[in-house]
Amino acid sequence: MHIMEGFLPVEHAIGWSVASAPVVAYGLYSINKKIKKNPEQRMLLGVAAAFTFVLSALKMPSVTGSCSHPTGTGLGAILFGPSAVAPIGAVVLLFQALLLAHGGLTTLGANIFSMAIVGPFAAAAVFRLARAARFPFGVGVFLAASLGDLLTYVTTACQLAFAFPDPVGGFTASLAKFAGVFALTQIPLAISEGLLTVVVMNALLRFNREELGSLNIEGNGQEVQA
């Protein structure tokens, strides 16, 4: 998903940065508000950030100019809401660009938009729909994390297709090519991420039940069954 340094045209890089900035700013406000109200949530916020950093650093080669990896943003979206994940993802992506050479500074806005905005908002929406449909809690967690991951890569494929449309088939043909290559690695990774998120949520429900109660997570103290 990390689009590498200098790969996008300048106007695209600027456009994605402008689109991402207000969401990240609102996310900072959201986090500050939540922490002021419940200071004990700092630990869970750190867990969500660490989960995102570790999973998204596990990359493998994929589409030219990008790579495949889990995103780890579904957990934070479920716990704190999608807007709070935007600044977390932004910091994670910035550190990875500077320290691990994953992604880049010029493509930071595009990477934030896909991994730290679209993915978390998709995960949160899927989780709410699953709970409204009375799916088991664990199924909701699994679907949220997995589909949030997949929609992150659909967004990246769209970004690349916009930047590099096919000479004959245009955007649609280019999107099909990018998405097809991503699918080979990302579908198994998304399933794995969903299962791992269920395991982590089980651990949080077991050892941090009190803190989770303040987040209005509807696990009701029960372990998640995937």
Swiss-Prot record:
Domain of life from the UniProt record: Bacteria
Gene3D superfamilies to which the protein is assigned, alphabetical: 1.10.1760.20
Keywords: Cell inner membrane, Cell membrane, Cobalamin biosynthesis, Cobalt, Cobalt transport, Ion transport, Membrane, Transmembrane, Transmembrane helix, Transport
Annotated membrane topology: Multi-pass membrane protein
Primary localisation category: membrane
Gene Ontology MF: a single term: cobalt ion transmembrane transporter activity
InterPro entries cross-referenced by the UniProt entry: CbiM (IPR018024), CbiM/NikMN (IPR002751)
Record-annotated membrane-spanning stretches: 6-26, 43-63, 75-95, 107-127, 135-155, 181-201
GO cellular component, one term: ATP-binding cassette (ABC) transporter complex
Disulfide-bonded cysteines: none
Keyword Cell inner membrane among UniProt keywords: yes
The keyword Coiled coil is annotated on this UniProt entry: no
One family name in Pfam for this protein: CbiM
Localization, UniProt: Cell inner membrane
GO terms, biological process: cobalamin biosynthetic process
NCBIfam families hit by this protein: cbiM, PRK08319.1
Role description: Part of the energy-coupling factor (ECF) transporter complex CbiMNOQ involved in cobalt import.
HAMAP family assigned to the protein according to its UniProt record, in alphabetical order: CbiM (MF_01462)
Record text on subunit structure and interactions: Forms an energy-coupling factor (ECF) transporter complex composed of an ATP-binding protein (A component, CbiO), a transmembrane protein (T component, CbiQ) and 2 possible substrate-capture proteins (S components, CbiM and CbiN) of unknown stoichimetry.
Name of this protein: Cobalt transport protein CbiM 2
UniProt organism field: Pelobacter propionicus (strain DSM 2379 / NBRC 103807 / OttBd1)
The organism's taxonomic lineage, starting at the top: Bacteria, Pseudomonadati, Thermodesulfobacteriota, Desulfuromonadia, Desulfuromonadales
Gene that this polypeptide is encoded by: cbiM2
